[in-house]
């Protein structure tokens, strides 16, 4: 494979860690096969002959990672803000996602989504597709061509959907998921599969059992939703009465992080360790103390989605508490609960809603500031 190597010159800004920002004027960042090989005030001898694009005094920053968004929902972003989660799903989301059974519609809608994502400041993303395997593979093909680094999930749901948006059985859902994973095996360089049970109310115990087996068989990460809305949490308790809390309804099937976790959220790490289950859970707005402890112990990543949590009135997650506890927290736009792909907006929203939580709900928990979001 031909080696791709080039350098950018300009004002470089990046964070070494949460507390240390680096600013370098008139400096170079070297890119090798899509990965940053280093940042230098002067080009080292080994890179002296690489092509350089001089950007003058323009700012060069790392791309953002959007930890949670729904590609099929981009077509109707900004609608349904008068509804809460469950009504929003039934009234708007499920009927719209059913349209992706039509590949011609999926191609048109996903083309717009991928193009807009490519021209945003996001370079990595964890993405929900729909339950439709052909449309999901189409989306992955488009994302691969875009050059973005993504994880994409074919959604699983065998209950509480709609006649047009529900898989016929747990066995059918599991079989289609296995077929999807086989179809895309070794097909992409920077587009990866991620197992995607929509959320507990959409998946029977039988399906969750099958997904647990698939996770161990294929060593894929997992993404889903957790403790987003009071009505959702109560519903999970009705559907899974033996679960101690919402997260336990995933954990009992081996779909909630890694016991004694120390691993990073890395697809290759998941592949190398048969006991590893890197997991992203979106929202965690109303997580109990016991659930939070399991999130910490098992290395589950929280995708904080402040715009969505505001738009559909879910609440304000205690993000400062999670950060102080050392939990893994990232940001998501959660389109179309959120209406914008802008991660700059997600950063600003995180700070704003954290201040509102401090002022209106809990003055013992300080708000976050930009220093927490580097």
Language-model features: where?
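Histidine-rich, glycine-flanked metal-binding segment
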Residues: 2-4, 13-62
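Alpha-helical scaffold segments that flank or form the walls of functional sites
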Residues: 30, 77-148, 172-187
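Active-site-proximal loop/turn and secondary-structure-junction residues that shape catalytic pockets
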Residues: 131, 156-158, 199-201, 228-230, ...
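Conserved small/polar residues in nucleotide/adenosyl-binding loops
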Residues: 371-374
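Metal-coordinating catalytic core of metallo-dependent amide/deamination hydrolases
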Residues: 138-282
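Glycine-enriched alpha-helix->loop->beta-strand junction motifs that scaffold or abut catalytic
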Residues: 216-218, 276, 296-303, 325-329
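Short acidic/histidine-rich active-site segments
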Residues: 222-229, 312-314, 320-346
């Amino acid at each position: 494979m031909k080696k791709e190597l080039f350098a950018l010159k300009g004002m470089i800004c990046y964070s070494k860690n949460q507390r240390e920002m680096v600013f370098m004027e008139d400096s170079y960042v070297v890119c090798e096969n899509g990965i940053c090989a280093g940042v230098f005030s002067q080009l080292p001898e080994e890179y002296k002959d690489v092509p350089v694009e001089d950007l003058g005094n323009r700012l060069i920053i790392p791309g953002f990672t959007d930890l949670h968004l729904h590609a099929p929902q981009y077509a109707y972003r900004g609608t349904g803000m008068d509804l809460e989660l469950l009504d929003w799903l039934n009234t708007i989301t499920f009927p719209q996602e059913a349209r992706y059974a039509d590949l011609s519609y999926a191609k048109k809608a996903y083309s717009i989504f991928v193009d807009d994502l490519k021209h945003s400041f996001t370079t990595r993303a964890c993405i929900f597709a729909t339950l439709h395997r052909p449309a999901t593979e189409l989306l992955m093909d488009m994302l691969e061509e875009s050059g973005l680094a993504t994880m994409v999930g074919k959604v699983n749901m065998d209950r509480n959907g709609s006649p047009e948006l529900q898989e016929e059985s747990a066995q059918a859902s599991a079989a289609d998921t296995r077929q999807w994973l086989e179809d895309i095996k070794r097909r992409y360089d920077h587009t990866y599969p991620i197992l995607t049970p929509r959320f507990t109310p959409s998946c029977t115990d039988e399906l969750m059992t099958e997904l647990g087996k698939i996770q161990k068989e294929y060593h894929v990460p997992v993404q889903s939703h957790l403790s987003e809305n009071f009505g959702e949490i109560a519903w999970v308790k009705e559907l899974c009465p033996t679960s101690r809390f919402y997260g336990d309804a995933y954990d009992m099937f081996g779909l909630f992080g890694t016991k004694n976790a120390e691993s990073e959220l890395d697809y290759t790490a998941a592949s190398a360790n048969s006991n590893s289950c890197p997991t992203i859970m979106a929202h965690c707005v109303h997580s109990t103390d016991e659930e939070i402890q399991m999130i910490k112990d098992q290395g589950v990543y929280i995708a904080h989605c402040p715009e969505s949590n505001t738009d559909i009135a879910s609440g304000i997650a205690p993000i400062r508490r999670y950060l102080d506890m050392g939990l893994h927290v990232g940001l998501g736009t959660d389109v179309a609960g959120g209406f914008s792909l802008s991660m700059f907006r997600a950063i600003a929203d995180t700070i704003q809603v954290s201040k509102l939580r401090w002022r209106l709900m809990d003055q013992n928990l300080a708000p976050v500031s930009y220093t927490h979001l580097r």
